[in-house]
Amino acid sequence: MHRYRSHTCAALRKTDVGSTVRISGWVHRVRDHGGVLFIDLRDHYGITQVVADPDSPAFKMAETVRGEWVIRIDGLVKARTEDTVNKAMATGEIELYAQEIEVLSAAKELPLPVFGEPDYPEDVRLKYRFLDLRRETLHKNIVKRTQVISAMRREMGNVGFTEYTTPILTASSPEGARDFLVPSRIHPGTFYALPQAPQQYKQLLMVAGFDRYFQIAPCFRDEDPRADRLPGEFYQLDLEMSFVTQEDVWDTMGPLMTSVFEEFAEGKPVTKEWPRIPYDEAIRKYGSDKPDLRNPIVMEAVTEHFAGSGFKVFAGMIASNPKVQIWAIPAKTGGSRAFCDRMNAWAQSQGQPGLGYIFWRSENDKLEGAGPLAKNIGEERTDAIRTQLGLGDGDACFFVAGEPEKFYKFAGEARTKAGEELNLVDRDRFELCWIVDFPFFEWSEEDKKVDFAHNPFSMPQGGLDALQNQDPLTIKAFQYDAVCNGFEIASGSIRNQSPETMVAAFEKVGLSQQDVEDRFGGLYRAFQYGAPPHGGAAFGIDRIVMLLVGAKNLREISVFPMNQQAQDLLMGAPSPATPTQLRELSIRPIPPVKKD
């Protein structure tokens, strides 16, 4: 018999009754029922119930074991009585009658519980992550993450992609976040950077004649902590294709990702045909470029119904500024004054002056609008709004006014709030879509200049002609995001493979041709030696797994994450370098300047 086990803790079945076996694992819990000891022994695969009664030769040793001790047990497999069968366990029809117990490793008093799923301070969980990972839910999440990545690799291979690896030590590149820098010992005073993404390398692979590249790519960004992103590093399914349009990318990756989602969705419906929603339409209908399509609320402009109306606030805004619009947020089943007042109070808590509303109710067999706005604009306009939005008895509508570029985010938040409060969101499904036709440029208030809105390596729609003849802020990009349930899960584009167009695009944001050659020299040179049209995307693995397992944050699906202060509490990183290390790198630390 093997030194440690003949079976795992999930393997034994009724067909093994009468066999003498050996299992090893962690003591999940010990129970004493009338002098008979029951030990649940756990390993990576599952749990087996072990029994030791006073007649067992292993009883005395069984009395000494404690939770999370690692032990080996030899015993006889017995069938459970019918009334003790546990159908919730794979091994629930049998139990192991202990004949010999060997303690392989005792455990100190635990700093956090492993049995069960009690809330515990996150810093304690991260410091003792090796214990935290023994918890059932977190352990399953990590296994599921590995399975999802394996499925992605399999599906990518099935549609002709090949996995290539790209360098981890590379040059610094302005891609929207700070780089993690690595000092060079051989070249004092110079630094490598950890890649924010393999963007330039995957494009260079296309120029080099490869096609359909992918990799499970680690990405590193020195960003301030955010609730929806892991500090330090994250992983993405990175891909690139040659001789493709954006439709080719969508037609390839949409069905592929639907297949991956369906494999792990546990029966929840998954979008098969992903809608393609232009960015401007997404902002207008949902107030967001990552809309949660499980929420049925669709906003509409109702400006005409308030122009010249008796509601002087909105009417005055419309008359004095042609950019002003009134957006309606229809809320089916929200037609009570109590709910409308709650929404208004919520808006004020968000720093807004309030949230105008109308709700409809039947009185004396007549459907009437109620609320201050209805009184001010009159029955005819109120009914026109109701008809436009398809509302009826027991429904409500909220209104946001101003210049859309200034209020659309709040309007989107109000849509989300109303959908959640009214339980309109179906949480047992995965709604996926493409958001397309992103703006290529945006105005930076901070720098008072035009800047790239997203990926600077995207191809502008209209190409060089658009850059030379259009207002930059009207130019769209061949750029797209994939969105699931209100989360961005991918971003991609058709790339700008023309040196002339590349230089013209960067000139719009204040960079010269020399700047382009200095910062993106490898890519710029490559494009002058025959570059195919190419495009791709990157899918965020961490976020996809988080959605699939229903985790509340990204740390619940990552093996050894940092905390929100970008610290690895288990390994003690970051940590000071030794004087010897600093001398070898020709580096002298400078204390940070204290801010007043």
UniProtKB/Swiss-Prot annotation:
Entry's EC annotation: 6.1.1.23
Alphabetic keyword roster: Aminoacyl-tRNA synthetase, ATP-binding, Cytoplasm, Ligase, Nucleotide-binding, Protein biosynthesis
Region (Aspartate): 199-202
Main location: cytoplasm
Localization terms from the record: Cytoplasm
SUPFAM superfamilies: Class II aaRS and biotin synthetases, GAD domain-like, Nucleic acid-binding proteins
Binding-site residues for ATP, renumbered to this chain: 221-223, 488, 540-543
Binding site for L-aspartate: 175, 221, 454, 495
GO cellular component terms attached to this protein's record: cytoplasm
InterPro entries on file: Aa-tRNA-synt_II, aa-tRNA-synth_II, aa-tRNA-synth_II/BPL/LPL, Asp-tRNA-ligase_1, Asp-tRNA-ligase_1_N, Asp/Asn-tRNA-synth_IIb, AspRS_core, GAD-like_sf
Gene Ontology MF annotations: aspartate-tRNA ligase activity; aspartate-tRNA(Asn) ligase activity; ATP binding; nucleic acid binding
Coiled-coil features, chain-numbered ranges: none
Function statement: Aspartyl-tRNA synthetase with relaxed tRNA specificity since it is able to aspartylate not only its cognate tRNA(Asp) but also tRNA(Asn). Reaction proceeds in two steps: L-aspartate is first activated by ATP to form Asp-AMP and then transferred to the acceptor end of tRNA(Asp/Asn).
Family the entry assigns: Belongs to the class-II aminoacyl-tRNA synthetase family. Type 1 subfamily.
Name under which the protein is recorded: Aspartate--tRNA(Asp/Asn) ligase
